[in-house]
């Protein structure tokens, strides 16, 4: 039988759990969690994603996205705007307040990532990022 600690699927799941826990910890004082941070990050990007695109990119159920978007919108951090390419759907964009909070949150997440990956050299971090991107996308 294979040793669980050497199975790639288990290692990726464990790394995700550890990373999410670290992100949630540093985002607590901003009243964000990893998932709401991810939505805010995409809303602050130039992509202007629809809720469906958010769900696909984040591998979440549509109802989970609605709850996340509603929560961020209630806080004045994002807003729904009609999609100029499809009036039947909305794009999700950040507000100025959302942009400011995202900048603060992004800094906290970057520092947490650096701490979590401190055992790796910068070259190893770049290699890890590249490999994970290939697997994820």
Question: Which residues does each predicted region cover?
Answer:
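Short alpha-helical elements of helix-turn-helix
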Residues: 6-10, 30-41, 52, 63
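Charged, amphipathic alpha-helical coiled-coil/dimerization segments
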Residues: 20, 48, 52, 70-133, ...
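N-terminal leader segment of winged-helix/HTH proteins
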Residues: 1-30
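The alpha-helix within a helix-turn-helix
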Residues: 55
């Amino acid at each position: 039988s294979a040793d669980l600690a050497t199975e790639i699927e288990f290692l990726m799941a464990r790394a995700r759990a550890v990373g999410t826990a670290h992100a949630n910890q540093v985002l607590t004082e901003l009243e964000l969690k990893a998932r709401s941070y991810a939505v805010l990050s995409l809303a602050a990007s130039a992509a202007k994603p629809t809720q469906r695109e958010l769900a696909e990119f984040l591998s979440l159920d549509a109802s989970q996205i609605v709850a996340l978007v509603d929560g961020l919108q209630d806080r004045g951090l994002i807003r729904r705007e009609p999609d100029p390419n499809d009036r039947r759907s909305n794009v999700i964009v950040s507000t100025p307040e959302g942009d400011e909070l995202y900048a603060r949150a992004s800094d906290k997440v970057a520092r947490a990532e650096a701490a979590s990956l401190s055992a790796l050299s910068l070259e190893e971090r770049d290699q890890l990022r590249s490999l994970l991107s290939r697997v994820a996308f």
